[in-house]
Amino acid sequence: MAKYNPLSELVRRVISHGGFVNSHAHFDRAYTITPKMMNKTHDHLFEKWEYVDNFKRNAAVGDYFENIKSAIDTQMFLNTRAACTFVDIDPVCEYNAITAAKIAQEHFGDEFPLVIACQTLKGVLEKKPRQL
């Protein structure tokens, strides 16, 4: 008699109901980590933001789009059917990430439904982030 495998049962049920949905992604940050950053995984969030900000300061809309597109391609390869991605809007990246996410949303259309949620990473208590 085969041993019961709850993971296999879960996957079977999810697929029978239309497949997986990634409901909390950060596709604008996909593929931005480097091996050098891996030893910083236990650092305080504010320290990690410095590394993230370095990418964001230098990333154009096209850079964000390529990362988002690659992440979605990977999700589709894994049979994920749709996703919600949280995208930064702040004084560092301004509208670059959200613009790229909207382009990706249009690019994939119904092939991969993408919900975009805005994330004001630097907070809304200061005037500049709030205005964005």
Locate predicted features:
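A near-ubiquitous, low-amplitude feature marking generic local secondary-structure context
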Residues: L10, I15, E47, Y51-N54, ...
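Histidine (H) residue identity feature
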Residues: H17, H24-H26, H42-H44, H107-D110
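Single, functionally critical "micro-switch" positions that shape active/binding sites
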Residues: V21-A25, Y51-F55, L78
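Active-site loop-helix segments enriched in His/Asp/Glu that coordinate
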Residues: M37, F55-L132
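Mixed-charge, polar/low-complexity N-terminal
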Residues: A2, P6-S8, E50, G62, ...
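Histidine-rich, glycine-flanked metal-binding segment
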Residues: M1-H17, A117
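Active-site gating loops and adjacent loop-to-helix segments of metal-dependent hydrolytic enzymes
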Residues: A30-Y64
